[in-house]
């Protein structure tokens, strides 16, 4: 199977052109190739597929083999892939995801995509649509939750996938390997949750660490950055335009109140192309 390793702010996936390649068991293949010791090594696998609703369709799989709904960094890399590898010559494209159809504007330099702006659509705060269960509340904004014996305040948002945003004094002091799984599997989240730990730098800047469901800590999460920026705005900690410092780089997030949509702008990088023998894995 031919593949391309790509990343957005260090959030790395193995990309497969499924307009040409066929994968019989994507869950098993994703788990195998994501292993950083025995596989290629990545946060998961993303398949670029045909779509009857958009220019292309994204099918994403986490490193544990589970299927994901949406990945902001991943969708930017798809945009770079399809342009750089000649699958399209358009600089505005649409990509179908399980979290909705996304529109992307491509910045091209010397024939290659360098930056991508994504319309991530409207953030969802209705608890039943995230889903998040919290008493009889219709929205969960800055509400206390006990995790591993400690009280945190959490804001729940969906960007096509569920997020719980928690503000902390210092992201460096979070024992994310210990607390991340406790949030991910908390009973208030029936479909598990991605958890963002946020440190406020100023009213235009935040630092973020993320524990992704099915993947653990990653260097970046685009939908998480969007959820975190919007949560910062809802909690009156920042304005509508926020620079998010992630472990793997920076993303610019802007909430357009008039359109009720979030725009994410960030880089997309190709690491290398390769081919892997999946005999015994995808038979």
Show which residues each predicted segment covers.
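A glycine-rich beta-to-alpha transition motif near the start of alpha/beta enzyme domains, typified by
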Residues: 1-112, 164-283
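Active-site/binding-pocket entry motifs
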Residues: 123-124, 270
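Active-site glycine-rich loop that binds ribose-phosphate moieties when present
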Residues: 124-153
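Membrane helix-loop-helix hairpins that form the core translocation module of multi-pass transporters
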Residues: 115-123
């Amino acid at each position: 199977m031919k593949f391309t390793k790509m990343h957005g702010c260090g959030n790395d996936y193995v990309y497969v052109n499924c307009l040409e390649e066929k994968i019989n068991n994507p869950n098993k293949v994703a788990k195998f190739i994501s292993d950083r010791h025995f596989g290629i090594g990545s946060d998961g696998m993303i398949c670029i597929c045909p779509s009857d609703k958009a220019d292309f369709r994204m099918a994403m799989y986490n490193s544990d083999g589970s299927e994901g709904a949406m990945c902001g960094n991943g969708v930017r890399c798809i945009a770079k892939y399809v342009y750089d590898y000649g699958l399209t010559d358009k600089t505005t494209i649409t990509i179908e995801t399980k979290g909705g159809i996304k529109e992307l504007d491509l910045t091209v330099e010397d024939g290659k995509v360098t930056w991508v702006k994504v319309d991530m659509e409207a953030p969802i705060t209705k608890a039943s649509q995230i889903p998040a269960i919290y008493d009889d509340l219709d929205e969960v904004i800055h509400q206390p939750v006990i995790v591993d014996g400690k009280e945190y305040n959490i804001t729940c948002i969906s960007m096509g996938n569920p997020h719980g945003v928690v503000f902390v004094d210092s992201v460096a002091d979070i024992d994310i390997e210990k607390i991340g799984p406790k949030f991910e599997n908390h009973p208030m989240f029936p479909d598990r949750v991605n958890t963002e730990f946020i440190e406020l730098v100023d009213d235009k800047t935040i630092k973020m660490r993320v524990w992704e469901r099915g993947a653990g800590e990653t260097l970046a999460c685009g939908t998480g950055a969007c959820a975190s920026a919007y949560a910062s705005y809802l909690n009156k900690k920042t304005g509508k335009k926020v620079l998010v410092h992630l472990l793997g780089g920076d993303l610019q997030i802007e909430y357009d109140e008039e359109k009720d949509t979030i725009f994410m702008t960030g880089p997309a990088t190709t690491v290398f192309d390769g081919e892997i023998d999946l005999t015994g894995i995808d038979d």
